């Protein structure tokens, strides 16, 4: 791996620096660290002065998060922040706010790419020009994708910045007269006028003795002949870099004619002719051999770049499509150009089909392209396809979590921006359906679950349906109780999942789609009374009875169904819905299942229903007494499971059962369940039980004179485990509950 690629991969695998963490936290919590002035702008409460490098990074971080506006730029007023290199990309600020926040600093660089239309290039330069120090010392100015002037499109303003060395003014209505003014700047060395309204570049002759870098990508309005253009270029003898690339829209022979010139651009080290017609390997090689100092040639979207000389493996870097090295160089250099990003990704996709090694450096380049062009469908489509190929199966295991987090965020954004594009949605779901991503990578799982559910409700593709419910089942288990309740409260979600269960039951089909759908419903109803009510109101109970009857030998199906019905039984308000003789009869028969997982959940349903007393039991009293005896005897026959067969968000649903001294079978089920999870996963459940006040409940059982001996024995065993846990780890402090996935 080349040194720069290795560095990129190492950077992603490393933890964020302390400075990055602090700045990100400050950025997302500005209201906690700032107070508001009378005009509504923010100022930091602490009086200290930030070092210049930190101030620059803070500004960049706020801009990156899309939080730079008239209010937040107030932080940079005064002298508390000392800016030198200011990045305000895509800021939403007014001309007045810009002047107050930035024009008193000693700026040497300003990147104002894509700021909102309320501020023009004239506003920015007028503000900068009000500071004499900036007039003489501002060296680099980036004004891409802005409006020149709202009042007077012919207003000239660049001459104020006499110290300017580098100017980028792409995607702007920038005319010949503006070029003439810029070319007269006494120190100008680098100029990017890509995709402007220039029709004639003759004005560049005014800076022919200074200009070292000239970028003229996609000059669509140029009216000069090829000979006239070359006559100007020939005079620019000090050029080190020349870019005349295009988006494959024109048939001009300018590139080939330039390559054939022997007496032109003697100091050139970098030439970009990507997207140009008539470019051949022979012509490119001859041009480079006449200029042995050449370090880069751009050949993407041309017919060249396929010879051994141009493979890009030596000191000469080549952007192209012939191999991975060329494609990576293209993605690196053209990250701001949507057409070239799409071209490079298209060719990368064909390579990644057979990729066997993890390529974090390549994935990072794909991420950059996705981030820079969020609303460009062709880019997002190609990028999402590449992401899947780069992260599928075991390849994801070698990817840094930090990089996968960025990828996942961008995939979700793509799904949000293009909800009706089926192939894009499919690409994103394919990538998201990864254990590595769903289990290990930090991202907004709540928003992801909502997006996937919306897709599921709008599409009927069977293969994609399986993936969607798999994703939802895992995400739902990772959400907090509050988030699960909020997600399940959306009636359409429960209805859609039940529809899938009904469809599979009618087809008598036990497949992964059915299993994942049942898991999703199980997780969504966990400690969520609203979701449980939606389940009942949508005839979920009747449907799940059919499932139990349709698949009597499928223990994994029975376990999931009974697990969800446990959640329903926990909700006291829904108790009467379960007082249904056929339902109770079927559950009681499953209590005697040879599969401990099935018997366990059947017992849980019965325990919850019996725990509410004789008055709440509206069926036969003799049946209740019989069930109590069966419950007690069944639990005593259970073998110790080899692994953790269930997971719980909290022990709160168990505590009411622990007080049922007149129904020992109910208590026995509760303590057996608690001992099971505490013995299989003590670090999680012992702490949880102590935090939630379980010790007192267990002591009550231990000391109560009516306690069943089997219940008492298990309670004492749990207390011993808890005491050992406290000795080993100390008494755990109160903490937020962490959601836990069920074992599917």
Curated annotation (Swiss-Prot):
Q: Does the keyword Repeat apply?
A: yes
* Gene Ontology cellular-component annotations: Cul2-RING ubiquitin ligase complex
The protein's UniProt keywords, in alphabetical order, are: Leucine-rich repeat, Repeat, Ubl conjugation pathway
Give the signal sequence positions: none
Could you tell me which Gene3D superfamilies the record lists for this protein? Leucine-rich Repeat Variant, Ribonuclease Inhibitor
Instruction: Write out the GO biological process terms.
Output: positive regulation of proteasomal ubiquitin-dependent protein catabolic process; protein quality control for misfolded or incompletely synthesized proteins
Transmembrane keyword on record = no
Residue windows of the LRR repeats: 185-208, 216-236, 237-261
Domain of life the protein comes from: Eukaryota
Q: How does it assemble?
A: Interacts with ELOC/Elongin C. Part of an E3 ubiquitin ligase complex including ZYG11B, CUL2 and Elongin BC.
Task of the protein: Serves as substrate adapter subunit in the E3 ubiquitin ligase complex ZYG11B-CUL2-Elongin BC. Acts redudantly with ZER1 to target substrates bearing N-terminal glycine degrons for proteasomal degradation. Involved in the clearance of proteolytic fragments generated by caspase cleavage during apoptosis since N-terminal glycine degrons are strongly enriched at caspase cleavage sites. Also important in the quality control of protein N-myristoylation in which N-terminal glycine degrons are conditionally exposed after a failure of N-myristoylation.
The record's family statement is: Belongs to the zyg-11 family.
Please report the name of this protein according to its UniProt entry.
Protein zyg-11 homolog B
Which gene underlies this protein?
Zyg11b
């Amino acid at each position: 791996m080349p040194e720069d690629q290795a560095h990129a991969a190492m950077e992603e695998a490393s933890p964020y620096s302390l400075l990055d963490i602090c700045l990100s936290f400050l950025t997302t919590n500005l209201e906690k660290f700032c107070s508001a002035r009378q005009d509504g702008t923010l100022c930091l409460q602490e009086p200290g002065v930030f070092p210049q490098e930190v101030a620059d990074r803070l500004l960049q971080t706020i801009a990156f998060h899309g939080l730079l506006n008239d209010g937040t730029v107030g932080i940079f007023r005064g002298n508390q922040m000392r800016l030198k290199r200011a990045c305000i990309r895509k800021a939403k600020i007014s001309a007045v706010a810009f002047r107050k926040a930035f024009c008193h600093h000693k700026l040497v660089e300003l990147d104002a790419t894509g700021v909102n239309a309320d501020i023009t290039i004239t506003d920015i330069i007028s503000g900068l020009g009000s500071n004499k120090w900036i007039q003489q010392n501002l060296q680099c100015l980036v004004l891409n994708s802005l409006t020149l002037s709202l009042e007077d499109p012919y207003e000239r303003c660049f001459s104020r910045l006499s110290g300017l060395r580098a100017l980028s003014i792409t995607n702007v209505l920038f005319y010949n007269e503006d070029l003439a003014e810029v070319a007269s700047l006494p120190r100008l060395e680098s100029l990017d006028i890509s995709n402007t309204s220039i029709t004639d570049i003759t004005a560049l002759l005014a800076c022919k003795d200074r200009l070292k870098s000239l970028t003229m990508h996609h000059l669509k309005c140029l009216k000069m002949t090829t000979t006239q253009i070359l006559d100007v270029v020939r005079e620019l003898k000090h050029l080190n870099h020349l870019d005349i690339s295009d988006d494959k829209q024109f048939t001009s022979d300018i590139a080939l004619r330039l390559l054939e010139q022997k007496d032109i651009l003697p100091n050139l080290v970098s030439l970009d002719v990507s997207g140009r017609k008539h470019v051949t390997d022979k012509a490119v090689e001859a041009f480079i051999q006449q200029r042995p100092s050449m370090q880069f040639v751009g050949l993407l979207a041309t017919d060249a770049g396929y010879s051994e000389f141009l493979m890009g493996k030596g000191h000469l870097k080549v952007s192209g499509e012939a191999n991975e090295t060329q494609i990576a160089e293209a993605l690196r250099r053209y990250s701001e150009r949507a057409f070239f990003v799409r071209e490079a990704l298209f060719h990368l996709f064909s390579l990644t089909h057979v990729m066997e090694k993890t390529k974090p450096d390549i994935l990072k380049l794909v991420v950059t392209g996705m981030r820079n062009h969020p609303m460009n469908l062709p880019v997002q489509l190609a990028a999402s396809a590449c992401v899947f190929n780069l992260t599928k199966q075991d390849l994801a295991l070698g990817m840094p979590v930090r990089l996968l987090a960025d990828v996942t965020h961008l995939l979700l954004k793509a799904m949000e921006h293009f909800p009706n594009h089926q192939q894009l949605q499919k690409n994103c779901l394919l990538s998201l359906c990864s254990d590595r991503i769903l289990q290990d990578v930090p991202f907004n799982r709540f928003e992801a679950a909502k997006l996937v559910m919306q897709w599921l409700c709008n599409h009927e593709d069977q293969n994609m349906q399986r993936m969607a419910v798999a994703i939802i089942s895992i995400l739902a288990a990772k959400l907090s109780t509050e988030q699960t309740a909020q997600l399940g409260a959306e009636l359409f979600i429960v209805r859609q999942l039940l529809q899938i269960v009904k469809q599979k039951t009618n087809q008598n089909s036990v497949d992964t789609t059915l299993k994942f759908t049942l898991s999703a419903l199980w997780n969504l109803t966990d400690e969520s009374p609203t979701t449980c009510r939606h389940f009942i109101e949508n005839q979920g109970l009747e449907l799940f009875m059919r499932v139990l009857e349709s698949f009597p030998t499928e223990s994994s199906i029975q376990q999931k169904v009974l697990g969800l019905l446990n959640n329903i039984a926990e909700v006291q308000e829904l108790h009467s819905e379960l007082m249904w003789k056929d339902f109770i009869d079927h559950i009681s028969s499953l209590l005697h299942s040879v599969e401990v997982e099935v018997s366990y959940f059947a017992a849980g349903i019965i325990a919850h229903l019996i725990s509410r007393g004789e008055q709440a039991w509206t069926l036969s009293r003799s049946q209740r007494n019989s069930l109590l005896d069966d419950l007690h005897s069944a639990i005593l026959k259970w073998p110790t499971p080899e692994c953790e067969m269930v997971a719980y968000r909290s022990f709160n649903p168990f505590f009411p059962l622990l007080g049922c001294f007149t129904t020992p079978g109910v208590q026995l089920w509760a303590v057996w369940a608690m001992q099971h999870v505490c013995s299989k996963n003590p670090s999680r459940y012992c702490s949880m039980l102590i935090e939630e006040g379980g010790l007192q409940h267990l002591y009550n059982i231990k000391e109560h004179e009516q306690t069943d001996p089997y219940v008492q024995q298990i309670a004492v065993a749990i207390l011993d485990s808890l005491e050992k846990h406290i000795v080993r780890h100390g008494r755990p402090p109160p903490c937020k509950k962490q959601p836990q996935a069920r074992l599917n």
